[in-house]
A protein has these predicted regions:
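Conserved glycine-rich cofactor-binding loop
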Residues: 16, 23-25
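A glycine/serine/threonine-rich, flexible loop-to-helix segment
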Residues: 5, 180, 190-215, 256-286
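C-terminal substrate-recognition "lid" of short-chain dehydrogenase/reductases
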Residues: 125, 220-249, 254
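Short, small/polar-rich loop/turn modules that mediate ligand/substrate recognition or access, typified
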Residues: 94, 179, 184, 242-244
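Alpha-helical segment proximal to the catalytic Tyr-Lys
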Residues: 133, 176-180, 240
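Substrate-binding pocket helix/loop in short-chain dehydrogenase/reductase
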Residues: 104-105, 112-117, 212
Length: 286
């Protein structure tokens, strides 16, 4: 059963697109949609086994995998060179890899802080820079960075909030500095998404993850497909005049978080979009 994309077949025919963190969650879902739309895919991440499983799901044809620590400049260069040796070009890049853990600022060690900043901000910089220098500076392309909402602070994840703020500012800056090369760069800012990553959070966070939908105007969690669709749009020719934006896909949570004066009534009028036949609801939300 193939991915049920809302975009036209063959949209990315002849294009090579890199997806970091492509072995699970949002990266896996995005990879499936891009493959359905004709892209040649390069999946890059830390764990080869995860990448290989997704490659098997997609079919071996036109799929390349490369395991690398994206916080390491030498490994990033090797990964980009590997993709170019395989595919000969890089038309699109999805910086989806990341990682964090819940903790209050007073409890975060320097090593923990540095690890989260490196996972979510430094890796985005390194991969984007090397893709730009090795291909896009002379050939153009599109980059989408997957982030998180940080504008109102991120209590319980201050390290992640700081990193994501820097990641979005990098998007804004690069969209100006690299525009002359025909490179567009944008961010997608997911809200609370029912992705497999939720199951990695400790049990003490489960009630918050389940109950947060009460604060979301659409009164539900988002789906992986709803994030993938935003990424696909920003990579596509339809977004040819779109650069330097942070596109929120959060069911209205950000705007509602600015005010405590209005309580959205409970409802079930927001119907989710799910085009991914292999998607499963995280256990924590069952």
């Amino acid at each position: 059963m193939s991915y049920r994309s809302v975009f036209r077949p063959g949209l990315f025919e002849g294009q090579t697109i890199v997806v970091t963190g492509g072995g699970s969650g949002l990266g896996r879902c995005t990879a499936h949609e891009l493959k359905t739309l004709g892209a040649r895919l390069a999946l890059v991440g830390r764990t080869q086994d995860k990448l290989d499983r997704v490659k098997e799901e997609l079919g071996d044809k036109d799929v390349f995998t490369f395991a690398a620590d994206l916080r390491d400049e030498i490994q990033v260069r090797a990964a980009v060179d590997g993709v170019l040796a395989w595919g000969g070009r890089i038309d699109g890049l999805v910086n989806n890899a990341g990682g964090q853990f819940p903790a209050q600022l007073k409890d975060i060690s320097l090593n923990g802080w540095n690890a989260v900043v490196a996972n979510n901000m430094t890796a985005t910089f390194l991969v984007s820079k090397e893709v730009y220098l090795r291909w896009m500076e002379n050939n153009g392309g599109a980059i989408v960075n997957v982030g998180a909402d940080w504008e109102l602070g991120m209590p319980g994840m201050g390290h992640n909030g700081a990193a994501r703020a820097g990641q979005v500012n990098f998007t804004y800056t690069a969209s100006i500095e690299w525009a002359h090369a025909g490179v567009r760069i944008n961010s997608v800012i997911p809200g609370f998404i029912a992705s497999s990553g939720l199951d990695r959070y400790p049990e003490r966070a489960h009630d918050v993850l389940r109950n947060v939908k009460g604060r979301i105007p659409m009164k539900r969690h988002g789906t992986e497909s709803e994030i993938a669709g935003a990424i696909v749009y920003l990579l596509s020719e339809a977004a040819a005049y779109v650069t330097g934006i942070a596109l929120r896909v959060d069911g209205g949570l950000h705007n509602n978080g600015k005010s405590n004066f209005y309580e959205v009534p409970d409802h079930d009028r927001s119907k989710p979009y799910n085009g991914f036949p292999l998607y499963r609801i995280p256990k924590v939300l069952e």
